[in-house]
Amino acid sequence: MIMLEAVYHRMGQNWSYAYNDSTLHIRIRTKRDNVPRIDLHCGEKYDPEKYKETIPMERMASDGLFDYWQAAVQPRYRRLVYYFALHSDNGDAVYFMEKGFFDQPPKVMYEGLFDFPYLNRQDVHTPPAWVKEAIFYQIFPERFANGDPSNDPEGVQEWGGTPSAGNFFGGDLQGVIDHLDYLSDLGVNALYFNPLFAATTNHKYDTADYMKIDPQFGTNEKLKELVDACHARGMRVLLDAVFNHCGHTFPPFVDVLNNGLNSRYADWFHVREWPLRVVDGIPTYDTFAFEPIMPKLNTGNEEVKAYLLNVGRYWLEEMGLDGWRLDVANEVDHQFWREFRSEIKRINPSAYILGEIMHDSMPWLQGDQFDAVMNYPFTNILLNFFARRLTNAAEFAQAIGTQLAGYPQQVTEVSFNLLGSHDTTRLLTLCSGNVERMKLATLFQLTYQGTPCIYYGDEIGMDGEYDPLNRKCMEWDKSKQNTELLAFFRSMISLRKAHPALRGSGLRFLPVLEHPQLLVYERWDDNERFLIMLNNEDAPVNVVIPAAQPGASWRTVNGEPCAVVEESSIQAALPPYGYAILHAPIAGTAE
């Protein structure tokens, strides 16, 4: 019996959307393992009998409760009416239309059906194509490298000392320029910088001047030199924009502090009670969290809006930036972000607009605001399995399935997939110092679709608890670097860049019930297929996997000697926290 109460579909968002200017993706949800087959019946609404087709739907993902199905449709006239035929094991079918469930198909094709009115090109969410090929590297500027001691702040401490909330070590833009060859050799092709604008703190999220690089980092001209040097190496550059709030030394806020309601900037901020003060630790004005030094900007004010849009415009036009990462993006009004996107895309249609949001973000990812968000839900899925070891492989696969079904495919393709940042405990620390477990998490990140980001120093084995210890100085002494881990990162980045299948959407998890901590999955495209096995257990495992392509020329990559390929199966002996990556060309393609 089909469990109708589990069936779900609606127009729009991640259920019925334009993937590109000629293709629609239609999705439906059913109870897990309850419906063996679904057909999508669709047609042209103004002549449905002449232009109609039946498309078998594919199970695109599953989680603990549901299966998610998808069909791609290219309507000849860009319009579509449709309904679903859900088939049971006994041959019966249920027909699902906008009006509900029926035991017979519609007598008239266009009555009571779901309706996609028209595929307007302007409505298609089209993230920049380059982001799908990008591998980001996050740099916390104050801690990456000190290339110019002449701009060190007063009281600068010796490089490599213990970080605190308020100390400085002299990292700057020249230090980044000096190490661009290192980043090129690592293989990354995009850099994301924490804030660079003038501020009082070491993290610079308390902006004092949005039009000026902080003097301890360098000058505006030095940033232009850095951007040009990155572009010459094929690297993109993303800067952090803090538009939710400013710093307490931002001149308009200083004016409000001094003049209260008489300040011409009084409406630039969200003041609940005058005069501005802090009562029992709570400011009388809205802030980021309850930080008195970070007053929240009123982006509904036309002057504030014009000022911030000019900031976004200036740095793209003058410096040639490739996009913005938007801090605390979910606390800024949607209308401002719509205008921001329009202005940024007018200047550079290929600019990447990335929002910092740590929860479900569908309202911001419909093509009118952000291209992507920082995918912290993905982060937590990986950390709970590989680092904290709170879940098993089946639960991991189910959580990934929920994520895949939660967004349109083009959003998933550019989702910012990170394993750590300046706001999290370091990956190696979460893995209890176990480098092999850290490798497994990184391996999945770099063989999964989306846009991976590496937090500076993770590749050499840097550790650190939560802020401020996760913001240590980059270790440049090679004798103190984990060079074997660095070689692993370089190898995996190279593998990802060489094989489009590892960046595409083809994904299937293969359950191995006798080994609950063994994660096995396939990645593929039209030309090649990968089988990847990750043993997230402190004991060796021996596993036999039926070959997805019997007779295919499967080969291990990266020199793993642990897998034996036979005609109908693949046998692997994996050491504790070991892995195997196998590759085969699709039949009929060149190897």
Curated annotation (Swiss-Prot):
GO biological-process terms attached to the record: carbohydrate metabolic process
Name used for this protein in its record: Cyclomaltodextrinase
pH note: Optimum pH is 8.0.
Keyword flag Glycoprotein: no
Binding site for Ca(2+): N146, D148, N151, D152, G170, D172
PANTHER family in UniProt: ALPHA-AMYLASE FAMILY MEMBER, MALTODEXTRIN GLUCOSIDASE
Catalytic activity: cyclomaltodextrin + H2O = linear maltodextrin
GO terms, molecular function: cyclomaltodextrinase activity; metal ion binding
Assembly mode: Monomer.
Cofactor requirement: Ca(2+)
Induction details: By cyclodextrins.
